[in-house]
Amino acid sequence: MLLHPQFDPVAFSVGPLSVRWYGLMYLVAFVQFIFLGRYRIKTRPGFLSVEQLDDLLFYGMLGVILGGRLGQVLFYEPAYFLANPLEIFAVWKGGMSFHGGFLGVLVAMGLWTRKHHLNWFEVMDFVAPLVPLGLAAGRVGNFINGELWGRVADASLPWAMIFPQSGDMQPRHPSQLYHVGLEGLALFVILWWFTAKPRPRAAASGAFLIGYGAFRFITEYFREPDHGIFGQSYTISMGQWLSLPMILIGVAMVVFAYRKKSL
């Protein structure tokens, strides 16, 4: 059984400015997006320019941050933020919903593709394999903060971990690291392999929805359930409710993409 290391949430300070690990992980996510995106541009010459990729990242950042925070407020902690409205703006403290951020990115990509007169699905297919490692970085930030810990685990589990922030000092699943392994590393490998060959339009986007939704549904069984807008449930969590439509829509997109290709 392990004890959570209890990292200082501040990675480093420069004068009065403190840089937190959680914010630093977002920076890592954005940097890897640019690095992998530029590599993919070379494999698809003429599709996007480096300048367009940088602009795409800017729109994506706005979508992630605004959508992620609003998703946290609306899906998971509406009562808390209603009582403490100024906390909505304290994004450096953590508290970002993936599903809210995902919806924010969809809107941002819609605006960006309209601005550049590009097909929305083709851009989303390009972006899909660039996302998982960024998600992994965010989950590493959750682990460093000692938040979003897992459900109580058997003390005999070698990697069971005590998170002092939970208040009960019981051994728990380090579910943040499960997210890193499945929704981050595994999904990245799958999508990078899947997009190595030309695929029908919307197939890669659909594969992302299926992969993320399925992996998130699995990892939620090891994560301490959030209360969410429907209250706390040990049968199916808010994250699982939000992942189900992702899986269904993803399957429909992949089926439609390949059927359209065969017509």
Swiss-Prot record:
- Record keywords, A-Z: Cell inner membrane, Cell membrane, Membrane, Transferase, Transmembrane, Transmembrane helix
Any idea which positions bind a 1,2-diacyl-sn-glycero-3-phospho-(1'-sn-glycerol)? Answer: 139
Give the molecular function GO annotations. phosphatidylglycerol-prolipoprotein diacylglyceryl transferase activity
A Gene Ontology annotation in the biological process aspect, one of them, is: lipoprotein biosynthetic process
- Where in the cell is the protein located? Cell inner membrane
For this chain, the family text in UniProt reads: Belongs to the Lgt family.
HAMAP family, alphabetized? Lgt (MF_01147)
Protein name from the UniProt record: Phosphatidylglycerol--prolipoprotein diacylglyceryl transferase
